[in-house]
Structures are given as C-alpha cells and as structure tokens.
C-alpha cells in the first residue's frame, strides 16, 4: 500500500517542486538581495546584536528574542538532522551547496517577511497581535487579493497538520527513539489492523509526545515562547558543539569534502551510479529541504514576528533574518558536512535519521551508543519545539480563515494533537514528500506577495537607515547608537 502511495506522492512532488517554483523562490531571494544591497551581509552583525536585545515600550505580546525563538523552534527541527540527510541521499552532496545558496538568498527573503509582518499587523478584539502573509497580502496588495491570502492560510493549516508541524517531526522522533531503545524490534505492538506491528518504543514515544504537546499548547503563544526560549538555544549549542567536534576529528578530510560538495552541485551525476542524479535534482532537493529547514519564503516566520514587542518593522526584519543564518548556514551545514565527511550518505540501506546517526557514531571519538543518545536527545527536543511552533502558525492561519472564530481554533488544537499521535506510523519517504508538497503550495502565494511588495520593503529599509545615517553625522554619534535610539521613538504605522 505504501509503495503505491509513495509513487503517487512523488509524481505530485515533482510537479509542485518543478523548475517554476524553484525559479520563483531563488529569483525572489535574488531580487530582494540586489534591491536591498546585500543587506544580509552588511547588516548581519547589527542583526545578531539586536537579536539578543529587547526593545523597551514596543507594541506586541512577546519580546523580539522570544519571537525569534518561537520562529526558530518551528525551523530548527528534523529538517536540520533528518532533512539534510534525505536531501544528500536523494540529490547527492551537491544538494548541500544549493541548500546554502538558497539560505543566503533566503536571509533577504526572511528579512522582508519580518518587516512586512510588523508593518501590516493588526490587533484582535482580545488584544493579541495578528500578522503574517495573509495580512500583508490583504492590506498591502489590497482587498482584491484576499483570495490569495486565504489560499496561503489554507495551505498553512495543511503544512501544520500534515507536513512540517506534525508527521515529519514525530516520525523523526520515533525513528530516533526506536533506533536507540529497540533497534531489532524485540517487542512489537499492533495498534490497528491496517497499520501492522510497531515497536513498543514507537508507541510509547507517540503517547508521551502527544501528552507533552497537549500540556504546552493549552498555554498559548506565551507558553510556547517561554518553552522555546529555554530549549532552543540550549539544544542548538549542544548540537553545534558535537558537530564541531566531529568535524575537528576529521579535519584532514574537510578540503576533499568541500570539493565533493561543490563539484557534485554542478555534476550531471551527483548521485553514485545513477544518470538520474543531476544538477537539477541536487538543486531541487537542496532548495526544497532548505525551505523545509529555514522556512525562508514559506511565510511561517512572519506569523511569529508579528507578535514581537517592537515598533520598528526594520528591526524585526533583521532579527528574523538571523533565524535563517543560524538554522541553515550554521546548523544544516554542520550536519551536511558531517554526513559527507563520514561517507554516511553512501551506506546502502540507511534512510532519514539513520544516516545522521551513522555519521555521529563513526565520526565522533565517543562510544557509538553515547553518540546515538546525543543525537536522539537533540532530535527529540528540536522536533518537539517545532511541533509547538507550528501549532501556533496553524492556529493563526485558521483564525484568519474562520474570521476570528476561536471555537474552531480550539477544536483544531485537539485535531493537531491527534496528528502528533498518528505521525510515527507512516513511512519516512511518504512523510517527507507530503511535507515538501504542502511547503511548495504554501510558498507560492507568499512569494507572489514579496515580489509585489518589494518596493515597500526597499522604501521602509532605506528610510530607516538613511535617517539614522544623517542623524549620526549631524550629532557625531555612532550609526548603531542612533539606530537603537530610533527604535524606541519609532511608531508602527497605523493600518
């Protein structure tokens, strides 16, 4: 049954992630990069500084750092560990190159999303902030494009329920737990007649995870933000440290690994032994998994950015931009390099988390069981916070679709928890293909909006920095000092 389903899903995936969508995403990032004057390079130090600072007196529900952590909680997940592995195995090492290229351009895209989210956000009757692509499409492009905003919101709900939010994350967690506690299926349980038998570790993991998710979701965005603010930085540092140790232990292989990655990115045979492996496949998998991981262009992060306590669209845009830098250019690159260095991507019979597990077991100077445990721990917490972040995104999308009917949102929350329980019982390939399909469909209306509103983005950016530059020259103060002072004086535009 799963074979037929996978074949059908692959056909749909190849259609959605064809050349037009890749051109749309890459061209959009390139256009914004050029029009903003390589802002992701010039303003990255300032963005990283502001990332750790809270703005006093800003409008919104949570701090900019909490908003970033909420966004990072949704982006740093199985995509960084499992997604990179599936991309390299399916598209060859060259997929990692295209993933980084897409992420570099995606930093300009993510900046633009964050800026528009704050500029066009509104406030609900109960006082919580509302923002995201559906609002900057409707308010920025005009009421005539409300249908496009609704399409985005619909696919946003689908991505949360069937894609990044639940199935892929829970599947990744259960695979890691299964591989660590019961790799030989010593004890199995039959849940439903048509599902077959599954390891007890998978069943217990799905039950515990569903309960934990339910416990946090009841608290809303503030509880999600508080949990994410603790877990995300801590686990990201742990994963970073162990990945760097792995690379240092194999430092002599690094030049050859980089050469392989770059060569394979432009090679007609990026996959060993297969004429199917081509530059197009490497690009397709790299861009698709990159979008899965950092969500630049997807339109999800601006939903969290709209809740940030800030009066400056530019400030939040810069803070949002750092998410893509941390998620893909740092964490995904470390994962991909680890996989290429250890040759894990060439081992037959491995898929998904098994590939990264092999890399950690054979690349780290620790016992294999300990290395597996560290990876499992990182994956569990990364995926858990992603599930939380995507529930928030999906609820805001549904709130927009239902005209603010919170009864629908509360019902959806329990459906979401049910989807968390179901996720482990699907095949890895089906889960990731479904995620890719809905990601692509969600990205299309958002990228159209970014193209249409690129003039607004450039105007807001130039006005902010030009004013700060002139004031700094007139008062003989530093540019950064003036920028920070202007943040506390600037008011969000009225809608």
Predicted feature descriptions by range:
Residues 10-46, 89-128, 148, 327-334, ...:
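Extracellular loop-to-transmembrane helix junctions
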Residues 24-31, 39-48, 170-177, 200-250, ...:
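Membrane-interface loop-to-helix entry segments
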Residues 33, 113-120, 125, 242-260, ...:
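Extracellular/periplasmic helix-exit of transmembrane alpha-helices
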Residues 1-78, 88-95, 106, 248, ...:
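N-terminal alpha-helical transmembrane segments of multi-pass membrane transport
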Residues 4-5, 36-40, 79-84, 160-173, ...:
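Transmembrane helix-loop junctions in multi-pass membrane proteins
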Residues 28-33, 73, 102-127, 134, ...:
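Helix-loop-helix module between adjacent transmembrane segments
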Residues 57-90, 116-140, 151-154, 158, ...:
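Alpha-helical membrane segments and immediately flanking helix-loop junctions
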Residues 38-64, 86-88, 92-96, 108-144, ...:
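Flexible loop linkers connecting adjacent transmembrane helices
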């Amino acid at each position: 049954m799963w074979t037929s389903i996978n074949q059908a899903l692959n056909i749909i995936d190849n259609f959605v992630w064809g050349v037009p969508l890749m051109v749309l995403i890459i061209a959009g990032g390139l256009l914004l990069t050029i029009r903003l004057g390589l802002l992701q390079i010039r303003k990255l130090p300032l963005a990283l500084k502001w990332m750790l600072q809270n703005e006093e007196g800003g409008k919104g529900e949570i701090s900019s750092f909490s908003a970033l952590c909420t966004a990072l909680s949704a982006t740093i997940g199985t995509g960084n560990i499992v997604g990179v592995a599936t991309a390299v195995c399916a598209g060859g090492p060259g997929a990692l190159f295209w993933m980084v290229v897409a992420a570099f351009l995606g930093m300009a895209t993510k900046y633009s999303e964050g800026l528009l989210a704050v500029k066009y956000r509104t406030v609900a009757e109960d006082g919580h902030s509302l923002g995201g692509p559906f609002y900057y499409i409707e308010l920025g492009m005009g009421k005539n494009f409300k249908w496009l905003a609704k399409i985005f919101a619909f696919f946003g709900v689908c991505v949360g329920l069937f894609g990044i939010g639940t199935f892929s994350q829970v599947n990744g967690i259960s695979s890691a737990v299964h591989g660590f506690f019961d790799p030989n299926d010593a004890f199995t349980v039959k849940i439903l007649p048509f599902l077959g038998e599954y390891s007890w570790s998978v069943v217990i993991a799905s039950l515990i995870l569903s309960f934990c998710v339910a416990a946090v979701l009841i608290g809303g965005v503030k509880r999600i933000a508080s949990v994410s603010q603790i877990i995300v930085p801590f686990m990201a540092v742990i994963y970073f440290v162990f990945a760097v140790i792995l690379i240092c232990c194999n430092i002599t292989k690094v030049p050859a690994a980089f050469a392989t990655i770059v060569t394979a990115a432009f090679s007609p045979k990026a996959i060993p032994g297969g004429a199917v492996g081509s530059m197009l496949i490497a690009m397709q998998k790299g861009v698709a998994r990159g979008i899965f991981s950092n969500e630049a262009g997807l339109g999800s992060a601006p939903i969290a950015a709209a809740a940030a306590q800030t009066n400056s669209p530019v400030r939040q845009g810069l803070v949002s931009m750092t998410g893509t830098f941390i998620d893909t250019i740092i964490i995904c690159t470390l994962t991909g390099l680890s996989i290429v260095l250890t040759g894990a991507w060439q081992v037959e019979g491995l898929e998904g988390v098994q590939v990264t597990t092999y890399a950690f077991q054979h690349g780290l100077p620790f016992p294999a069981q300990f290395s597996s445990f560290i990876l499992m721990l990182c994956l569990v917490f990364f995926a858990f916070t992603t599930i939380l972040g995507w529930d928030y995104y999906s609820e805001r999308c549904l709130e927009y679709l239902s005209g603010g009917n919170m009864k629908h949102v509360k019902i959806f929350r329990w459906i979401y928890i049910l989807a968390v329980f179901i996720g482990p019982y699907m095949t890895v390939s089906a889960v990731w293909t479904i995620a890719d399909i809905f990601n692509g469909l969600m990205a299309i209306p958002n990228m159209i909006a970014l193209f249409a509103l690129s003039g607004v983005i450039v105007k807001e950016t130039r006005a902010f920095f030009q004013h700060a530059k002139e004031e700094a020259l007139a008062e003989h103060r530093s540019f950064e000092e003036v920028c920070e002072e202007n943040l506390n004086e600037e008011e969000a535009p009225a809608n």
